[in-house]
From Swiss-Prot:
Chain span(s) of sequence motif WLDD motif: 145-148
UniProt-listed Pfam families: NCBP3
UniProt subcellular location: Nucleus; Cytoplasm
Keyword RNA-binding annotated: yes
Biological classification of the source: Eukaryota, Metazoa, Chordata, Craniata, Vertebrata
Biased composition range(s): Low complexity: 595-604
Subunit structure: Component of an alternative cap-binding complex (CBC) composed of NCBP1/CBP80 and NCBP3.
Region named RNA recognition motif (RRM) domain: 116-177
Segments of skewed composition (Polar residues): 458-469
Biased composition regions of type Acidic residues, renumbered to the chain: 199-219, 331-349
Keywords: Cytoplasm, mRNA capping, mRNA processing, mRNA transport, Nucleus, RNA-binding, Transport
Region listing for Disordered, in residue ranges: 1-36, 168-219, 319-383, 457-604
Protein's UniProt keywords contain RNA-binding: yes
Organism: Gallus gallus (Chicken)
Name recorded for this polypeptide: Nuclear cap-binding protein subunit 3
Length: 604
């Protein structure tokens, strides 16, 4: 059997293993017997075990690599030899000097230094693109945001970062005068040597190169003050302003990291909007952030469902429409912890959110989001798997459709629908009637033609008094049944009825004699002409007082008919002179009701 070994891991809070004194060589393990435990110590620092969660924003325009160490002594000596060979004398530029920087000495003086990274402070009101544009002469690889006022600019090599720091910044103001005096002395000495060399150049032939000692080539050696400042890693002021801001830079260290809760305390996000939460401005609560994360995950699930819906055979329940926000990042955002002490945002991109009505710029932001997804870390892939799992859980199963149906079933379903609709209509009408209340026949608006037809039917059915329908204006308007005429004495108690209104009452002509108009002889007349024309006027009352058994001759009927027609025409002309023709029927009914009500009041 193989020997059983035990693994013992010792983790130190700080990486002090490198600075500790080296121990002697460990003794070789003795032969381990069967069943005996052997301890193997493994030393790791706590920072190595904790993953790096800092967010990096790459330069899409491309980075730059120097390739050779131009700050080394050998490279500077070759440059000077080449310049003397071609008799080239460049102007003295204090910003770009040939400074030989010993990086090994820097690493010893500053153990945690990052020579490929420059720490910059004073970047208020500056975005990521503004910083990339500031270092366009030495394009960096990416940027690490620390807070609103500072960030780390990272290059792919140490040489380019060193060149950018030396050429784009100067020494602090306190040591600047001393350094300036030394530089002036050096420039004066160089000018003297150049004059001496020009006098000796005439003696040398063209194409010949003088044998020079490399040690004689002078470099811009750093003064003791400048060297001490670099070893202390002091902040160096930048040579030019950026958006009115005075920048300071130095080499970054491993301690220059984003603090917890920096995004929550960011004034830049409060002023310009947080692109990680849809460009919302101001202070965002934890509950609102959780709701936003849940909606974001749900939206991503719907997006992926639409992409693979055709392959699986499913269709999305609805389409999601985005808002009019521009520059909103499309990559999934890691959820924050509920405790405020642990809250930290990986997303810290400086993007000014713009609100527009058109969705055309939104497509560009989606393209940028797709490009970012391709360069995302391995943590994003885990979140994608989580979204796919959510999608498979939330996707509904396809609905089963009935394939075999009978015609009788379809007819029955149609009948059920018709019955249900009829019931619903009846219930609706009954509810309306209950709310409005039932109306009698007296409230209905009746047309004049309907009144004439009703009068004709009443005249035809005068012989059956039980079938007479009351059509008085007062009855139609809901007045109390009061008859102004005197009942004739009769032994049989007949039902009281109201007098039928004639043409005169319908045309608005006041009645001349109400009591003498209706007599028993009129009830005996059976001619259709009398029923259509109504009762005769006052001038024809004497002709209507004939005995019941007498039969009028045709000539008398014709003359009487002519007189009636003449009287009607005359009355019609008079009515036209008094008032205009009635165009609106309801107004006619109102006038009649007023006359009838006034007549009933006077008679009563």
């Amino acid at each position: 059997m193989a020997a059983v070994r035990g693994l013992r891991i010792s983790v130190k809070a700080e990486a002090t293993a490198t600075t500790a004194e080296p121990r002697g060589p460990e003794p070789e393990p003795m032969e381990v017997e069967e069943g005996e435990l052997e301890t193997i110590p493994v030393r790791r620092s706590l920072r190595e075990l904790i993953p790096d969660t800092s967010r990096r924003y790459e330069n899409k325009a491309g980075s730059f690599i120097t390739g050779i160490d131009v700050t080394s002594k050998e490279a500077i000596e070759k440059k000077e030899q080449r310049a003397k060979r071609f008799h080239f004398r460049a102007e003295v530029n204090l910003a770009q000097r040939n400074v030989a920087l010993d990086r090994d000495m820097m690493k010893k003086a500053i153990p945690k230094v990052r020579l490929d990274t420059i720490y910059i402070c004073g970047v208020d009101e500056m975005s990521t693109q503004d910083i990339f544009a500031y270092f366009k002469e030495y394009p960096p690889a990416h940027i690490e945001w620390l807070d609103d006022t500072s960030c780390n600019v990272v290059w792919l090599d140490e040489v380019t970062a060193t060149r950018a720091l030396i050429n784009m910044s100067s020494f602090p103001d306190q040591e600047k005068p001393k350094g300036g005096e030394n530089n002036e002395e050096k420039t004066a000495e160089k000018n003297k040597k150049e004059k001496q060399e020009e006098s000796t150049d005439d003696e040398t032939e063209e194409g010949e190169v003088e044998d020079e000692n490399p040690s004689d080539i002078e470099l811009d050696a750093l003064t003791q003050v400048e060297e001490d400042s670099l070893l202390r890693n002091d902040l160096r002021p930048a040579n030019k302003l950026a958006k009115g801001n005075k920048l300071f830079m130095r080499f970054a260290t491993k301690d220059d990291k984003k603090e917890l809760g920096a995004a929550r305390r960011s004034q830049y996000y409060m002023k310009y909007g947080n692109p990680n939460y849809g460009g919302m401005k101001g202070i965002l609560s934890n509950s609102w952030k959780r709701r936003y994360h849940s909606r974001r995950i749900h939206r991503d699930v719907i997006k992926k469902r639409t992409l693979i819906g055709d392959d699986v055979g499913l269709t999305p329940p609805y389409k999601h429409r985005h808002s009019g926000l521009v520059n909103v990042p499309e990559e999934p955002i890691e959820e924050e912890e509920e405790e405020e002490e642990v809250q930290d945002m990986d997303e810290d991109d400086r993007v000014v959110v713009e609100y527009r009505d058109d969705l055309q710029p939104f497509k560009q932001s989606r393209d940028r989001g797709a490009a970012r997804r391709s360069s995302a870390s391995a943590s994003d892939s885990d979140e994608m798997d989580y979204d796919l799992e959510l999608k498979m859980i939330s996707t509904p199963s396809p609905k089963k459709s009935m394939k075999m149906t009978m015609y009788a079933d379809e007819v029955e379903s149609q009948l059920k629908n018709i019955r249900n609709s009829m019931r619903a209509d009846s219930i609706a009408t009954s509810n309306v009637k209950n709310r409005i209340g039932s109306k009698g026949l007296s409230d209905k608006v009746v047309d004049v033609r309907l009144l004439l037809e009703e009068k004709r039917q009443n005249n035809n059915g005068l012989r059956q008094p039980n079938s007479i329908v009351k059509s008085d204006v007062r009855q139609r308007l809901g007045k109390r049944p009061h008859s102004p005429e005197v009942k004739p004495p009769s032994s049989i108690s007949a039902p009281r009825r109201e007098p039928i209104s004639d043409v005169h009452s319908r045309l608005g002509i006041p009645k001349q004699d109400v009591k003498g108009l209706y007599s028993d002889t009129r009830e005996k007349k059976s001619g259709n002409l009398w029923t259509r024309l109504g009762s005769a006027p006052k001038t024809q009352e004497k002709t209507s007082d004939k005995p019941e058994n007498s039969v009028a001759s045709p000539e008398e009927d014709d003359s009487e008919l002519q007189r009636v027609w003449g009287a009607l025409i005359k009355e019609k002309g008079e009515s036209r002179q008094k008032k205009s023709r009635l165009d609106n029927l309801p107004s006619l009914q109102i006038e009649i009701s007023r006359e009838s009500s006034s007549g009933s009041d006077t008679e009563s």
